[in-house]
Amino acid sequence: MWENKFEKESLTFDDVLLLPAESDVLPKEVDLSVQLSEGIKLNIPVISAGMDTVTESKMAISMARQGGLGVIHKNMNIEDQADEVQKVKRSENGVISNPFFLTPEESVFEAEALMGKYRISGVPIVNNKEDRQFVGIITNRDLRFIEDFSIKISDVMTKEQLVTAPVGTTLDEAEKLLQQHKIEKLPLVKEGRLEGLITIKDIEKVLEFPNSAKDEHGRLLVGAAIGIAKDTDIRAQKLVEAGVDALVIDTAHGHSKGVLEQVKHIKETFPQVTLIAGNVATAEGTKALYEAGADVVKVGIGPGSICTTRVVAGVGVPQITAVYDCATEARKHGKAIIADGGIKFSGDIIKALAAGGHAVMLGSLLAGTEESPGATEVFQGRQYKVYRGMGSLGAMESGSNDRYFQEDKAPKKFVPEGIEGRIAYKGSLQDTIYQLMGGVRSGMGYTGSRNLEALREEAQFTRMGPAGLAESHPHDVQITKESPNYSF
């Protein structure tokens, strides 16, 4: 040990480039899908970080529609986080197998509150919650001129000429019925009992977002962060009940006893849910998490733009080497890793994937988009969005202190491992993802990689020094117009 103390030399994104290779692959032909776990297939290898200025339901919905995955952060109470998951799961469906419903005796106020909370335009009405015989429907059109919201639903709901379809109706058949009768919602019934629902909005979304990442029921995929705090069991239970597809045990040091015990416990309690755990930066840490029960391991200690772990704690591994070392171990287990942090350009994404990552987790590249929950502010005439690390003082005060094993400390005693800042406003997530994936596709064309597995297995790197990095960026010219995929 002593003799080898300084033996390890590590590399990061700016130290390497991918070698171009003979190629018969065009960028538009590459396959960006990845089977992250048995239950999760993504159509792009991108996951939005579980940070309180990056991912809530709005970001997670948009990420899944683009083919990726959003991880809802945990800096909120358990009920609110479960609600955020439900918003994603109910945002669109092929067929809604467990639709919301109300009874005629409930008030119009309850119908209005339910529609407002989940942004839906109507609710089926059943005779009672046990028999669930379909008797009517109430929509936002029925509520437009109502002044007294305490009246019963039965006074305003549509009861006559109800259009229904049997269970098993396909989306194509449903679309014809919806158009024929000029309605937006088609209840699915079996012997009069409400069993499902198909809406015109869901059909339109299927056509608008054909690349969406969905579960077996046609609902958008979503993940949620949990930690190792005392309420973790209850939080995980509520998230699973809400329909979460992946639980993410999110800590600064995944190769620690408490985290490994939590991974083992959560996997034993919820074996059907994909378990992502981290963060680690060594093969040994990766092995320990897999053996504890993790399905996917998250790699990265200190590379993030808002992370100060490496300068505060003096610990970490430059990200390309960390990804490669952890991926080498992952291959032995036949499992996936996620490269989390340090990515500044689309070129860094393909480097992380070529080094062994199955997907990347992004924070700063997405924090400036319209869909992020960070506050918008104007500075020197330009729009920005607030972006902070989960190890920053503000985030720790809001609930992420257990991530850094400081849950028992008073706020004045916190030792932050992150900063708070701002990032330029970028517009829609869809445009950002388009540019990022365009860069990845271009890179795979250069390396001759038809899919991500070929990229991982066959792509080769060359090392470069500071002069090579300087040569890689625009030089000897003054940039006069911003590019949508480059700023330095």
UniProtKB/Swiss-Prot annotation:
Q: What is the enzyme's class at the highest EC level?
A: oxidoreductase
GO BP annotation list: GMP biosynthetic process; GTP biosynthetic process
Source organism per UniProt? Staphylococcus saprophyticus subsp. saprophyticus (strain ATCC 15305 / DSM 20229 / NCIMB 8711 / NCTC 7292 / S-41)
In which residues is IMP bound? S305, D340, G341, G342, G363, S364, Y387, R388, G389, M390, G391, E417
- Where are the stretches annotated Disordered? 467-488
- What's a single GO MF annotation on this record? metal ion binding
Q: Where does K(+) bind?
A: G302, G304, C307, E471, S472, H473
The primary gene name is: guaB
Domain CBS, residue spans: 95-153, 157-216
What name goes with this protein?
Inosine-5'-monophosphate dehydrogenase
Pathway membership of this protein? Purine metabolism; XMP biosynthesis via de novo pathway; XMP from IMP: step 1/1
